[in-house]
UniProtKB/Swiss-Prot annotation:
Annotated Acidic residues bias: 309-320
Keyword Signal: yes
Keyword Lyase appears in the UniProt entry: no
Family the entry assigns: Belongs to the 11S seed storage protein (globulins) family.
CDD domains: cupin_11S_legumin_C (cd02243), cupin_11S_legumin_N (cd02242)
Biased composition (Polar residues): 565-579
InterPro entries: 11S_seedstore_CS, 11S_seedstore_pln, Cupin_1, RmlC-like_jellyroll, RmlC_Cupin_sf, Seed_Storage-Functional
Name the UniProt record assigns to this protein: Conglutin alpha 3
Lineage: Eukaryota, Viridiplantae, Streptophyta, Embryophyta, Tracheophyta
Function: Sulfur-rich seed storage protein. This protein found in the seeds of many leguminous and non-leguminous plants is the source of sulfur-containing amino acids in seed meals.
Domain of life: Eukaryota
Length: 585
């Protein structure tokens, strides 16, 4: 009797598990069965020493439908957003200001190195003394950004941002929580390397606390429970480690470990660097060099060039006449090329020797000599042997690992007027960034569309064929209408600066700017998101089909298909006539 009972019990458990899984799938599907869309504003606000962090409630039905979360960071001048990473990719839109972005990509080398001369210059600027025992700094590439840029942050990659401008730096972050890179649940998480930042998504923290209360055994020791309560609020990833273990693992003293974990300091998401941030950067290096060279702009370089020419002429005069006679019809020429200034401020030169050989017909043959030999002598050892083998072996294709990971392009200015994809002088302009213009977006299945509508300009009805879209208003105000598959209007209201609106896939949407214009960015969950303008669809359908489908005359069908612009940017009829009259006058 035991075997049938166990069999039936096992079958019941399997059915319960299957129904639970199906229920989760249906819940995920039903999240996009939205009868009404809402304009979303930030729900949480964290004020730090160097700025403000705002987040949207990730449990909002619209955001759960799109599978994304949003953050907004306002960084004051000299503000530093502490290093952190997430388990999903991010797109950052720079709404205002300028600054620097640092990313520590795992497995990539530190390509920015500090020379001794540049170190002393930096220390002179700060009024510090150089210490010979301190090791010269090196780090990975520093990227600079400005208003209108979009930045792509890979998952699990620590990054930091710094505002070196004179105004506030405002950045809006999209976090793709349902990305395949995220192997955890879709609740947003951010892992900070430093500080004691506050929880950015308190709704997820409440859910975790409720689960822990249900899962906590009743007989748990009081000491262990007290220890867990003491660790609450320590939100950087180093705080949870044992100090002695961390000291041995990182080979540092206990005082340094204490500062890394800083259990008592309340340093939040954004700090202020009072003396300014000093890192290795060609942009900042050139600015320092220009300041130092104001006293003698070009005199020193001219003197060095003149002395070098005199030395070359002296060497040619001292050369034996027999060697010059032996050359006969051969003419030797030294070409010196300056390639700018190095990181340490010193000039470096590369010399190549070109030999011009005159044949019987007066033709010249030019060949470069000694360049490879000089490189071999300078490098020596393994490098020279490897270079020699590469020259002897036939050309082969590179694997592309370093080019695609360590030197990937992560920035593009989507708001630049010169790169507009669609433009109407009286209606506005549209620019897109996808995996064709910014290849790294193809890794994460994301893209963006920038829309700047002029006064009363219209972005005609259209829909996103293969992506959800999330609109963030940068400036101005506009009227937005969204219609679902049942033909019902799920949103028909004004959107203003700082608001979000989710437009699900294939929902038809239209925009019209107000008197002050309408500027927004639309993040999309496909690296090659495609829009289908309604007017273009009508033009692709035969006239007879439209006439019978809508009960229209052929004249009406002709007006429907061919009146107006070919692109979805439309100017109101009255404004278009006024514009034409002004142009004629």
């Amino acid at each position: 009797m035991a075997n049938p009972f166990l069999l039936s019990l096992s079958l019941c458990l399997v059915l319960l598990y299957t129904s639970a899984c199906l229920g989760e799938g249906l819940d995920r599907f039903n999240e996009c069965q939205l009868d009404r869309l809402n304009a979303l504003e930030p729900d949480n606000r964290i004020e730090s020493e160097g700025g403000v962090t705002e987040t949207w409630n990730s449990n909002k039905p619209e955001l759960r439908c799109a599978g994304v979360a949003f953050e907004k960071h306002t960084i004051e001048p000299k503000g530093l957003h502490l290093p952190s990473y997430t388990n999903y990719p991010q797109i950052i839109m720079i709404v205002q200001g300028e600054g620097a972005l640092g990313i520590s990509v795992p497995g990539c080398t530190e390509t920015f190195e500090e020379a001794q001369q540049s170190q002393s210059r930096q220390e002179r600027r700060r009024g510090q003394r150089s210490q010979s025992q301190e090791q010269e700094d090196s780090h990975q590439k520093i990227r600079h950004f400005r208003e209108g840029d979009i930045l792509v942050i890979p998952p699990g990659t620590p990054y930091w941002t710094y505002n070196y401008g004179d105004e506030q730096l405002v950045a809006i972050n999209l976090l793709d929580t349902t990305s395949l890179s995220n192997q955890l649940d879709p609740n947003p998480r951010r892992f900070y390397l430093a500080g004691n930042p506050e929880e950015e998504y308190p709704e997820t923290q409440q859910q975790r606390q409720q689960r822990q209360q249900h899962q906590r055994p009743s007989g748990r020791r009081h000491g262990q429970h007290q220890k867990e309560e003491e660790q609450e609020g320590k939100n950087n990833i180093l705080s949870g480690f044992d100090p002695q273990f961390l000291s041995q693992a990182l080979n540092i003293d206990e005082d340094t470990v204490h500062k890394l974990q800083n259990p008592n300091e309340r340093i939040k998401q954004i700090i202020r660097v009072e003396e300014g941030l000093g890192v290795i950067s060609p942009k900042w290096q050139e600015q320092e060099e220009e300041e130092e060279e104001k006293e003698e702009p070009r005199q020193r370089r001219r003197r060095e060039r003149r002395e070098e020419r005199e030395e070359e002429e002296k060497e040619e005069e001292d050369e034996p006449r027999e060697s010059r006679r032996h050359r006969g019809g051969h003419e030797e020429e030294e070409v010196e090329e300056e390639r700018g200034r190095g990181r340490g401020g010193s000039e470096w030169k590369r010399t190549t020797r070109r030999r011009h050989t005159r044949g019987d017909e007066g033709q010249e043959e030019e060949e470069t000599t000694t360049t490879t030999e000089e490189r071999r002598r300078r490098r020596g050892g393994r490098g020279s042997r490897q270079e020699e083998e590469e020259e002897q072996s036939p050309p082969r294709s590179r694997n592309g690992l370093e080019e695609t990971i360590c030197t990937a392009i992560l920035r593009e200015n989507i708001a630049d007027p010169t790169r507009a994809d669609l433009y109407n002088p009286t209606a506005g302009r549209i620019s897109t960034a996808n995996s064709l213009t910014l290849p790294i977006l193809g890794w994460f299945q994301l893209s963006a569309e920038y829309v700047n509508l002029y006064r009363n300009g219209i972005y005609a009805p259209h829909w996103n064929i293969n992506a959800n879209s999330v609109i963030y208003v940068i400036r101005g105000r506009g009227r937005v209408q969204v219609v679902n598959s049942q033909g019902n209007s799920v949103f028909n209201d004004d959107l203003r600066r700082g608001q979000l609106l989710v437009v699900p896939q294939n929902f038809v949407v239209a925009h019209q700017a107000g008197d002050e214009g309408f500027e927004f960015i639309a993040f999309k969950t496909n690296d090659q998101a495609t829009t289908s303008p309604l007017k273009q669809v009508f033009r692709g359908i035969p006239a007879e089909v439209l006439a019978n489908a809508f009960r229209l005359s052929l004249n009406q069908v002709s007006e429907l298909k061919y009146n107006g612009n070919h692109n979805p940017l439309v100017t109101p009829q009255s404004q278009s006539q006024d514009h034409n009259l002004v142009k004629v006058a």
